[in-house]
């Protein structure tokens, strides 16, 4: 299995009325993170564990593939 640092994660995004959700998924071990960006207030970061159906779930929920740069800017606190 590939080392954690060698994994190319997949990133997704969905805009809601009052927030945006960014998701990062490790496609090998199905773990990742979710950043909730409310229009007002502080971002919330959660670590998540997924299963093999995550791709269908994200598609059904209206998430679209997005940029790793955007996710990592919010995760590092450089974007607000």
Residue ranges and their predicted role:
Residues 4-34:
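N-terminal acidic leader/helix
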Residues 4-5, 43, 48, 64-68:
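Short linear sequence motifs
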Residues 7-10, 18, 40, 52, ...:
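Short linear motifs in intrinsically disordered/low-complexity regions
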Residues 28-58:
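Acidic, low-complexity, intrinsically disordered interaction modules
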Residues 58-80:
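Short, compact, well-ordered microdomains
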């Amino acid at each position: 299995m590939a080392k954690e640092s060698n994994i190319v994660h997949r990133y997704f995004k969905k805009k809601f009325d009052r927030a945006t959700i960014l998701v990062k998924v490790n496609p090998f071990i199905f773990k990742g993170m979710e950043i909730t960006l409310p229009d007002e207030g502080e971002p919330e970061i959660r670590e998540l564990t997924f299963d093999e159906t995550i791709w269908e779930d994200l598609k059904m929920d209206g998430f679209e593939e997005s940029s790793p740069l955007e996710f990592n800017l919010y995760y590092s606190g450089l974007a607000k």
